[in-house]
Amino acid sequence: MPRQFLILISFLLLSVSTLADSSLPVVEIKADRTMIYPQRMELTGEESLMDILQMVPELLIGGYEDVLSSYNLRIDNCPMNGDTRLILSQMKAKDIAKIQVCDNTGVAKGTIGMGRVLDINMKMPERLTGFAEGQGDFGKEVVGIGSVNALYGSQHTDLYANASYRHQNGNEEYLTLHMTNRFDDRNRLLTYFTQQYIDHPAAVSRKVMGRARYFHTFNELGTELLLVGGYQYASDPVLSNKLPLFIAELNTPLFSERLSMMLGVEGDFLMTREKDTDRSWNVFNNDIYLQFTYSLPKWKLTVGNRVMFYNYNLKEGGISQKHSDTRNNTNACIVYVPDNRNQLQLGYYRKYYNPSYLVLFMDASTLYDEEWMKAEGLLEEWDIHQVKLAYAYSKQKLTVQTEASYYAVEDEENFTELDVSAYWKTKGLTLTGGSNLYIARSGTSASLRFAPTVYLPCDWQIGMQVVYYTKKSPTRELYGTPVYGCLSVNKPFGKRWTLGVDWHDMFDAFCSDALVNRHAANVKLQYRF
């Protein structure tokens, strides 16, 4: 009898926990980013990261190799290197704790201009030690592409590795190593190393980077200190660069649990040498950033600012030219959460864009000649002001997100972006779709995407991604194809093996207007141990 009673209590606790998880929102809007929690969704177990990313309203798919648009892919805030397609198409949603879609993190992450970050926080597979996976790409004009992805975990250590190789009129090799050490409940160390080697007939280049991130939690309230140190070296036939960097950041409640503060300092020292002329220049960036969030039961108010101090020095012929300047990234945002299903956001963001250092130090024209005219010997900024209105409705099987942003760009064309996405899950079928609309005086363009997935008997999974571009869409003008398509077939074999095939850029094979024939088959294999 006592044993049956304990079983009943355990079942009730599990039921309450499940109901609590189902009541939590799948999507959470924050001041500078949107959080997606795959574990709160109803998953079959075989959904990929790419399937979840279809929920992102501003996702712009330009092709199988241009899925993330302007997003920089990171894992635990460490930039990924090389071929990221395997990560997108093969990483399981059940292995992801949360996805941070950072579209306005100029204060928190120091992104410049329209730069965005897609940060993946992984979790170890349940009852498994890890997984290993690989892929190979076979096409008419794209040949010799392969990647390997692996995750291994123990009680105190997780190790993630990604390596990719590409042979197409040259060789490209990429390696990423990512290790997390949990010393105890309050101390954690994350180390990161990446290397790339590119050997093309025109030039050979290489880059290595190492970074360490140490986290210490002081108390039960969540006061946390982050310390970061890193170094990067890059070299090509024209330039060589050395870049040491540091970050110190404190996140803590302030005075009460309702008010939280993020305070940080960040700096790097870029040393560049032009090999042919032996000219050199140094750029020292030093940032101070502060952000406050005040939370009420249904309201969240966030204000923040990052001040960036630039000091740059050009050395040539014994003469030293020095310049200094200051930049500001600012945000102010209010989020209204009437219940656990609906969220509404109104935000203002001030960003800036700098001309390339090459324009100033090498007297060289970039893709935009106006950059040199704008610089006139100084790195003068262009201000970008964004006003954003967003709404999200989310639960386990249905999520709808809409975003509207107006951008006022200094000395450039102002424009408006309207984005919407929807996700719906029913028995044996998942439907995801969205649209992106760009409006400016010079013209209007749009894209429409639809991504259904069917779950068949014997664990077969068939998915399709279709994106249509209007005539003035930059993607259509670049590739000539009005439609992008990718057909995916996946089949698990037992509990450990999964085999998949992606036929990507498939309409390039049939469209006479295609400027590049990119269609190919990508074969993927995963083993979980």
Short names for language-model regions:
Residues 121-134, 173-175, 182-186, 262-269, 309-313, 322, 336, 340-386, ...:
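Surface-exposed extracellular loop regions of Gram-negative outer-membrane beta-barrel proteins
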Residues 49-52, 86, 111-134, 146:
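N-terminal periplasmic accessory domains that precede
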Residues 78-104:
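Short acidic/polar hinge/loop motifs at secondary-structure boundaries
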Residues 135-140, 154, 165-169, 193-199, ...:
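Transmembrane beta-strands of outer-membrane beta-barrel pores
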Residues 24-27, 50-81:
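Extracytoplasmic beta-strand/coil segments of soluble accessory domains associated
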Residues 168-245, 270-272, 281, 353, ...:
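Flexible loop and strand-edge segments within Gram-negative outer membrane beta-barrel domains
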